[in-house]
Amino acid sequence: MESGRLIFSTAGSGAGQMLFLDCGAGGGGVGGGAMFHRGARPVLGMEEGGRGVKRPFFTTPDELLEEEYYDEQLPEKKRRLTPEQVHLLERSFEEENKLEPERKTELARKLGLQPRQVAVWFQNRRARWKTKQLERDFDRLKASFDALRADHDALLQDNHRLHSQVMSLTEKLQEKETTTEGSAGAAVDVPGLPAAADVKVAVPDAEEPALEEAAAAFEEQQEQQVKAEDRLSTGSGGSAVVDTDAQLVVGCGRQHLAAVDSSVESYFPGGDEYHDCVMGPMDHAAGGIQSEEDDGAGSDEGCSYYADDAGVLFADHGHHHHHQHADDDEEDGQQISCWWMWN
């Protein structure tokens, strides 16, 4: 810069002008040729810098289009779409929410808009659509949640009610079992002792065999007694009728019922059982026993009655046997070798 020239910028003024002070070479003061010049700012970048907007040195066509569109979107320069354009764009969005380049160009040509405007409208519309979709999904999920929560609360109430019922029933059952056990303990139950009805039935059953045996023996005795009476009542010349007590046959310590025949032979059980028993006549001198022919009548006090012809055969042996066993009969008092016989 040449000496004597000064440049002042008037940034505070809204016109953006500059002042030049030119001092002459020969001037020594203000009156010596100093001059002031006022002019506009020649640099475009400085004018834009006053607005605070920085423009890059190299720009692409897309960046220029975007800058122009956003400049149009400013509040003072925003262009509103007509209802016909909005309706056509909405219908196109319902058909397909994705915007292809060919479709974007065609829509811009039909609507008389810039392709960039159509693209931005579709982008904003998709965002609103997604927001609405999320809101609908949220409302649906919230309704489902509320329904499930109500069902859960109802199930909890039912669960508490059933639990209370179970507890009350359990308490009643325990009380019933306690009452039953108390009543059962009051009644004395001895497992080892039979019931009263069983005792009444069991006692006759225990005595029944003995009673039957006694009845059978009594019947047999009665039958043999009848047979003996029949035979005694129908005897021949030397026979006699004796009392009922004479029908008891005593031998070897055991009593037996025997039917006596009118002949010499008399009825006795097996010989093995009466091997110690003998038959023989007993007179008055020896045993104090008299026969029917001695006194003319039958005596019940004697032990044996023998005919004279049959008594001869056993006289000696019977008398000897009687004295031999007399002492033994007195000691035990049980064995008596006496027999009855009729002819």
Curated annotation (Swiss-Prot):
GO terms for molecular function: DNA-binding transcription factor activity, RNA polymerase II-specific; sequence-specific DNA binding. Probable transcription factor. Keywords: DNA-binding, Homeobox, Nucleus, Transcription, Transcription regulation. Expressed in seedlings, stems, leaf sheaths and blades and panicles. One of its GO terms (cellular component) is nucleus. Its main location: nucleus. Residues 74-133 bind DNA. The keyword Cell membrane does not apply. Transmembrane segments: none annotated. GO terms for biological process: positive regulation of DNA-templated transcription. CDD domains: homeodomain (cd00086). Pfam families: HALZ (PF02183), Homeodomain (PF00046). This is Homeobox-leucine zipper protein HOX16. PROSITE patterns: HOMEOBOX_1, HOMEOBOX_2. Gene3D superfamilies: Homeodomain-like. It is found in: Nucleus. Residues 218-239 are annotated as: Disordered. It comes from Oryza sativa subsp. japonica. The gene is HOX16. Belongs to the HD-ZIP homeobox family. Class I subfamily. Residues 132-176 are annotated as: Leucine-zipper. The keyword Nucleus applies.
